[in-house]
Structures are given as C-alpha cells and as structure tokens.
Design a protein with these regions (language model features):
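Central antiparallel beta-sheet cores of small beta-barrel/beta-sandwich binding domains
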Residues: 34-122
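K/E-rich alpha-helical interaction surfaces of small helical-bundle regulatory domains
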Residues: 26-42, 146-153
Length: 153
C-alpha cells in the first residue's frame, strides 16, 4: 500500500513539474505589453495562459491612461456577459490554437475590442525570438482588419 501511495505521489509531482516546465517553454504564455496601433502608447498588459483544452486566452491584468484621454475601467460596450465588467480580469483574447504546420502561428481565435465592444476573428504570429506578438483582428477574411504588435516582458 505504501509503495502504491509513493508511486501516486511521485506521479503527481512529475505531472506538476512537467506542466510547469512546459508552460515555461511555451513562448506565447506570459505577460505582454499591448501597444495601441493608432497612438503607439501602451494601453494595457495582458497575461496569456494556455488552457487545459490546449487553447490560449489572454486576460487584462493592468490598464494605463493615454495622455489626454480619460482612463477607462469598465467595459460598457462589451457584448453579453462581458458588458459592464471591469477591464482588469477581462478575457481579451480566447480560443487561439497553435497552428500544427507553423508553431509560431496561432489561429481560430477571437479578439475583443474593449473600447468598441466588438468581437473579431483573430490570428497571431510570434517573432522567431518569441519577444513580439503580432495579433490580427478581422471580419470575414483577414485582409479586412487591423494588426497590433505586443512586446513580451
């Protein structure tokens, strides 16, 4: 009985350590500084996590003022259950899957514009060094959309 218990504990520890190691080696996981493509100011920090189903989501963890503009704290324009939720903790991107043909690309995601409240289809591409993420939100086909680049902390 003691051997079985020791084996179970060892297995759980190994699984936990393996999961932590995997997350540390996953270049998309971590904290990112968003850069507004229109003003070039950093508006927020987003924490990207890998979910148990293998998809990625990003949660807003910090917001900043743009000089001369009022700081927004609540997502008044967001749809559905996200309406009137605070920006901090708000799911901002979700459903992204790593492209099996290109591990630096992530596809089939959704992107929330927390200012306008619209949800767009999304795709993302990591730089070769894993320090920059180009995120594209679009309607229909990716030609009709806009891209932003984030910087990893």
């Amino acid at each position: 009985m003691k051997k079985e218990f020791t084996g179970i504990v060892a297995g759980l520890l190994l699984a936990t350590v393996s999961g932590v190691s995997f997350a540390e080696n996953d270049p998309l996981v971590g904290k990112w500084k968003t850069i507004d493509d229109r003003t070039s100011y950093s508006r927020a920090d987003v924490e990207i996590r890998k979910k148990p189903d293998g998809t990625y989501e990003g949660i807003i963890v910090e917001t900043r003022n743009i000089p001369g503009a009022e700081k927004m704290n609540i997502c008044h324009q967001c749809p559905g259950q996200l309406k009137n939720k605070p920006f901090i903790g708000l799911p901002f991107i979700w459903g992204f899957k790593q492209d099996p043909k290109n591990p630096l690309q992530f596809v089939q995601g959704s992107v929330l514009d927390p200012i306008g409240g619209k949800v767009y289809k999304g795709k993302a591409r990591l730089s070769a060094n894993g320090k920059r993420l180009t995120l594209r939100g679009y309607v229909g086909v990716s030609v009709i959309g806009r891209s932003v680049t984030w910087i990893k902390y």
